[in-house]
Amino acid sequence: MTETPFWQRKTLDEMSDAEWESLCDGCGQCCLHKLMDEDTDEIYFTNVACRQLNIKTCQCRNYERRFEYEPDCIKLTRENLPTFEWLPPTCAYRLLAEGKNLPLWHPLRTGSKAAMHAERISVRHIAVKESEVRDWQDHILNKPDWAE
């Protein structure tokens, strides 16, 4: 008999730090820069990748020291999760907080990121290097329906 996966038997608050970290599918969507309108606080999504994001692997080059390299890097925690309304509907943290299960392509279910990349969930097919961008406003993406 197989054991029920931890994400189905524990709440987000009950998970260990290692379990919490493993929920991240590594899609890189958090690592794309967002612009905020100073007057309306509206968030605009771009395809501009953080300098630390390896676009091919969708992994941070310096994850353990990312805040030293990128002071504006976000740290998603159990406490601040509700404030990140811009998280995509595919995000495991968002899904589990909403009482949903992980999608079939999630690396915790498949054992690899290949299915996630094949489903085009990751940013590897849209991300551009920050160093190659002159005007970030030229890289604003159409607002996803889920971000309404």
Swiss-Prot record:
A Pfam entry, by short name: CxxCxxCC
Domain of life: Bacteria
InterPro entries: Puta_zinc/iron-chelating_dom, UCP006173
Family: Belongs to the UPF0260 family.
Name used for this protein in its record: UPF0260 protein ESA_01462
Source taxonomy: Bacteria, Pseudomonadati, Pseudomonadota, Gammaproteobacteria, Enterobacterales
